[in-house]
Amino acid sequence: MTTVSYVTILLTVLVQVLTSDAKATNNKRELSSGLKERSLSDDAPQFWKGRFSRSEEDPQFWKGRFSDPQFWKGRFSDPQFWKGRFSDPQFWKGRFSDPQFWKGRFSDPQFWKGRFSDPQFWKGRFSDGTKRENDPQYWKGRFSRSFEDQPDSEAQFWKGRFARTSSGEKREPQYWKGRFSRDSVPGRYGRELQGRFGRELQGRFGREAQGRFGRELQGRFGREFQGRFGREDQGRFGREDQGRFGREDQGRFGREDQGRFGREDQGRFGREDQGRFGRELQGRFGREFQGRFGREDQGRFGREDQGRFGRELQGRFGREDQGRFGREDQGRFGREDLAKEDQGRFGREDLAKEDQGRFGREDIAEADQGRFGRNAAAAAAAAAAAKKRTIDVIDIESDPKPQTRFRDGKDMQEKRKVEKKDKIEKSDDALAKTS
């Protein structure tokens, strides 16, 4: 809000106050003139007439009191009222990182000065042992009234104190003088005019006119008019008008209008419009819109859209799309792309060579799918072939230049396939001769 807006609001409030005062004055005049014509006794039926239900002479008394269309106009419908409340880019800037944020909050050397360390602060507050022990007149008249030297008798003392008389007589200004206070001063227990235990006019324990424990007119513990613990008019602990602990008008702990702990309108702990602890609109601890702890839109702890701890879209702990712990799409424990090991359960070998063996890596297509055995001669032949093939595979793996898919060229791969085929045929012939 600009300065012009504040000036306009102040002028409007001033006009309303002046108008209400004028109306109140007119009402008092009318009421006083009406009271002169009526009897004000309790038993008179005309006593309450016109008090709250204005007589038939003025049926318009309550008209427009709360139904005035201009009364609520502009209260919340002003297009400038909400402007900049949540869309200010500087909204969360400097919430807790500002070195000046907490400066002077509770470390002001003058803040606690004289609160409880003043040697005169507690003097005469709750103990007055010397006077109680030595002065026999200390408690005289404190809790009981002595009727000595009173013109009225004891039975007549309370007559007319709290009940109106039937004659409607007007009370004198001095009627209550000295009724419940000491003869010397109007104070009840204290040493000043209106203090109860303190030394000032209206203070209960403090030293000022309206303070309870503090030194100012309206402060309870503080030094300002309306502050409870702080030094400003309306602040409770802080230094501003409406802040509770902070320095701004409406902030509770912060410096801005509506923030509870921060400096902006609606943020609680963070620096953005709707974030709780983070810096973005919807993030709780992170910096993005929907992330809880991370920096991306939907991630909980990570930096990507759907990852919980990782950096990719769907990974839980890893960095790839579908991997759980690794970096590949569908691998369970490893990190390979599984294009090399299409569907292997425990190993990394190319199971296109073994064609779905359950426990081993052998070519069970030759063993005719026996569950526990390998039927007849086919089973023995398959076992021998598997044993020989295992040896051949070991020899191939011990080759100083093993087969690789990415280093060797196409010609080298063809050459190795031919050599491997020849070795297998020779081993089959030798096995047939022995059988």
Curated annotation (Swiss-Prot):
Function of the molecule: Not known but it could act as a transmitter at neuromuscular synapses.
Phenylalanine amide modification, residue list: 197, 205, 213, 221, 229, 237, 245, 253, 261, 269, 277, 285, 293, 301, 309, 317, 325, 333, 346, 359, 372
Biased composition, class Basic and acidic residues, residue ranges: 230-371, 398-435
Keyword hit for Manganese: no
Modification type Pyrrolidone carboxylic acid: residues: Q194
GO cellular component labels: extracellular region
Family, as annotated: Belongs to the FARP (FMRFamide related peptide) family.
Region called Disordered, residue ranges: 230-374, 386-435
Database matches in Pfam families: FARP
Keyword Secreted: yes
Residues in the signal sequence: 1-22
UniProt name for this protein: Antho-RFamide neuropeptides type 1
Prosequence residues removed at maturation: 23-193, 199-201, 207-209, 215-217, 223-225, 231-233, 239-241, 247-249, 255-257, 263-265, 271-273, 279-281, 287-289, 295-297, 303-305, 311-313, 319-321, 327-329, 335-342, 348-355, 361-368, 374-435
Compartments, record wording: Secreted
UniProtKB keywords: Amidation, Cleavage on pair of basic residues, Neuropeptide, Pyrrolidone carboxylic acid, Repeat, Secreted, Signal
Gene Ontology biological process terms in this record: neuropeptide signaling pathway
